[in-house]
A protein has these predicted regions:
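Membrane-embedded segments
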Residues: 1-60, 69, 87
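Short alpha-helix in the alpha/beta-hydrolase fold that links the catalytic acid
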Residues: 19, 127, 136, 150-159
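Primarily recognizes the serine-hydrolase "nucleophile elbow" in alpha/beta-hydrolase
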Residues: 60-64, 68-112
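Short beta-strand/loop motif that positions the catalytic acidic residue
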Residues: 133-135, 140-146
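Acidic catalytic loop of the alpha/beta-hydrolase fold
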Residues: 145-149, 175-177
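Catalytic histidine neighborhood in serine/cysteine hydrolases
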Residues: 155-176
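Post-His helix in hydrolase/transferase enzymes
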Residues: 178-193
């Protein structure tokens, strides 16, 4: 199996090295891509382009002999919206969402409650509307102390998602999960099950 890691908005690929090192302990292949305009890449990181980047990564893996049904989509924060979008094909092995939001509009309303964000935001990432279309197994992980994307958003997606599904609320973590041994074991058990 191969994890396709779709990273979040802040930082760069190096900032995910501790997660990738932990995932490497599971004896899986891991491919992480850098979005347009991240880590020195050119281009505009809009919703359509990020979906396209992820689809190209899937095609690249397919061209290297990795079947789609052996790919685990792993979305982190911003990347969760991309994972939900392309996961609707239901061809993937499973999907893991770390610190997901219900939609970019609802997440933005938390920070800008008096602005008409629905009309100002071009990129919507409406996972709340799309996740019901996914039939593959889903693991949703969220830190209880997340002050960027509230944990209730992950719980809401879990409620809407089809079975099989699992929700992990990590009591001591915030937006970026610590990837301790307990969390790694939960991820391993989920991956081994499917």
């Amino acid at each position: 199996k191969t994890i396709l890691f779709l990273h979040g908005n802040a930082g760069n690929l190096f900032n995910r090295s501790y997660k990738l090192n932990r995932l490497n302990e599971l004896n899986l292949n891991v491919l992480i891509i850098s979005w347009r305009s991240f880590s020195g890449n050119l281009g505009k990181p809009n919703e359509t382009n990020l979906y396209g980047d992820a689809k190209k990564a899937v095609k690249w893996l397919n061209d290297k002999g990795v079947k789609t049904e052996n790919i685990i989509l792993y979305g982190e924060s911003l990347g969760t919206g991309v994972a939900v979008e392309i996961g609707q094909t239901n061809k993937f092995n499973s999907i893991i969402l770390e610190s997901p939001y219900t939609s970019m509009i609802k997440a933005a309303k938390i920070y800008y409650p008096y602005l008409p964000v629905k009309f100002l935001l071009k990129d919507k990432y409406e996972s709340e509307k799309k996740i019901k279309n996914i039939k593959t197994p889903i693991l949703i992980m969220h830190g209880k102390k997340d002050d960027i994307v509230p944990c209730y958003m992950g719980k809401k997606l879990f409620e809407i998602a089809n079975k099989p599904k699992k929700f992990l609320q990590i009591e001591e973590d915030d937006h970026m999960l610590s990837f301790n041994d307990n969390l790694l074991l939960e991820i391993q058990n989920f991956i081994n099950k499917y």
